[in-house]
Amino acid sequence: MTKVSVDDEFIKFSYSSPMIRSCLLDAGCLLELHTYYTREESGRYSDCRVGVHIDWDGVINGQEIDVENEIDVMLLEGVVPVFISCKNGRVNQMALYELDAVANRFGGKYVRKELAATQEITPGYLKRAEEMGIVVCMEK
């Protein structure tokens, strides 16, 4: 932040760039970046990407609305794809089903699925994740 000023009623400041502003205002963005950097720095992965958009039919439809999903963090460990969904709030059933559906459709037979979460997950959702082959990672 730049141009910080404080008085009795207000704290005023400017962001150093639009990207920094976006990251600081979107808590999910920070979790995605944290997850990305920790995985990338591990050295286990040959490729690491954040915010990957996947087009379900692979056809570019111009201006028309197309069915897309975003994978928060996508990795390759050798030839094994790893799909990671980051949840900064409560994890619900839809989060698990979306990760499972997208990873199974585009990841192939050996895909690995991870859910990076910041809040505790209920035992029922943890069991469901285990049944779906989703590894839950608690991020701090």
Task: Please place each PLM-identified region on the residue numbering.
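Intrinsically disordered, low-complexity Ser/Thr/Pro/Gly-rich regulatory segments
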Residues: M1-K140
